[in-house]
């Protein structure tokens, strides 16, 4: 039988490292709540980024997925994850930087993504995955609350911006619940939140997504600039 999440981490002397953006979750009930929010079906293929000490990993595995692939860059966590694998042979462990891996590299036809994302790369990962939306069943992600609010923001609100446009162009977005800093070790300085993104049945082409990404980057470059002025770099003859 596996020890508790906290005891398992302590047995491997794993302390959070700032360079990896690590804030560990030792509360198994919170991990279970995140997985419930995903509506994970049995026999799904699942991807988790940054499993760390394996709390969310355990909760996912308890739902009997066909496979769970975890991508972890911190070599200290690999022996701990291998011990979890002894109980769950359907766990696949990849030691790699998540930014260096595309979903197509993993051979998925469809995958469900459930992750407590490292906040310093979370937005970049979301944008990359949106371009591979045809391979994704849904994504249930923990991010900074501010980022989740921007993903879900409606037009004419202060939070509405580039991330809102791109995410809502490709997926149906739903904020699930907030997570207080006290849920983590060490507690971060900001609140977190869980967001669920479900790709639309007919997502736009990658070419269109790239164009929208380019336009919105310019359009929202400065809140005080006129959009016309911002877009002149992209469309020189705009009037």
Curated annotation (Swiss-Prot):
Protein residues bound to S-adenosyl-L-methionine: 23, 25, 50, 72, 97, 116
Native source organism of the sequence: Rickettsia felis (strain ATCC VR-1525 / URRWXCal2) (Rickettsia azadi)
PANTHER family (alphabetical): DIMETHYLADENOSINE TRANSFERASE, DIMETHYLADENOSINE TRANSFERASE-RELATED
Keyword hit for Methyltransferase: yes
Subcellular location: Cytoplasm
Catalytic activity reported: adenosine(1518)/adenosine(1519) in 16S rRNA + 4 S-adenosyl-L-methionine = N(6)-dimethyladenosine(1518)/N(6)-dimethyladenosine(1519) in 16S rRNA + 4 S-adenosyl-L-homocysteine + 4 H(+)
Origin: domain of life: Bacteria
Family: Belongs to the class I-like SAM-binding methyltransferase superfamily. rRNA adenine N(6)-methyltransferase family. RsmA subfamily.
Alphabetical UniProt keywords: Cytoplasm, Methyltransferase, RNA-binding, rRNA processing, S-adenosyl-L-methionine, Transferase
Keyword Hydrolase carried by entry: no
Protein name listed in UniProt: Ribosomal RNA small subunit methyltransferase A
Enzyme Commission number: 2.1.1.182
NCBIfam families: ksgA (TIGR00755)
InterPro entries tied to this protein: KsgA/Erm (IPR001737), rRNA_Ade_diMease-like_C (IPR023165), rRNA_Ade_Mease_Trfase_CS (IPR020596), rRNA_Ade_methylase_Trfase_N (IPR020598), rRNA_adenine_dimethylase (IPR011530), SAM-dependent_MTases_sf (IPR029063)
Biological role stated in the UniProt entry: Specifically dimethylates two adjacent adenosines (A1518 and A1519) in the loop of a conserved hairpin near the 3'-end of 16S rRNA in the 30S particle. May play a critical role in biogenesis of 30S subunits.
Gene Ontology molecular function terms on file: 16S rRNA (adenine(1518)-N(6)/adenine(1519)-N(6))-dimethyltransferase activity; RNA binding
A GO CC term attached to the entry: cytoplasm
């Amino acid at each position: 039988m596996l020890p508790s999440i906290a005891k398992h981490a302590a047995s491997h002397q794993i302390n959070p490292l700032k360079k990896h953006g690590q804030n560990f979750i030792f509360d198994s009930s919170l991990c279970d709540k995140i997985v419930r929010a995903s509506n994970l079906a049995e026999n799904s293929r699942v991807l988790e980024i940054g499993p760390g000490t394996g709390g969310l990993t355990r909760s996912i595995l308890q739902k009997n997925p066909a496979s769970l692939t975890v991508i972890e860059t911190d070599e200290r966590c690999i022996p701990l994850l291998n011990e979890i694998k002894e109980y769950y042979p359907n766990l696949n462990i990849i030691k790699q930087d998540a930014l260096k891996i595309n979903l197509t590299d993993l051979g998925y036809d469809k995958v469900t993504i459930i992750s407590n994302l490292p906040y310093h790369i979370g937005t970049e990962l979301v944008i990359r995955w949106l371009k591979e939306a045809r391979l994704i069943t849904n994504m249930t992600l923990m991010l900074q609350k501010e980022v989740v609010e921007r993903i879900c923001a409606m037009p004419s609100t202060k939070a509405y911006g580039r991330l809102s446009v791109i995410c809502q162009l490709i997926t149906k977005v739903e904020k699930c619940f907030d997570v207080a800093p006290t849920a983590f070790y060490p507690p971060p300085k900001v609140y977190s939140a869980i967001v669920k993104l479900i790709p639309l049945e007919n997502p736009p082409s990658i070419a269109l997504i790239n164009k929208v990404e380019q336009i919105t980057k310019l359009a929202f470059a400065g809140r005080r600039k006129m959009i016309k002025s911002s877009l002149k770099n992209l469309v020189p003859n705009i009037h």
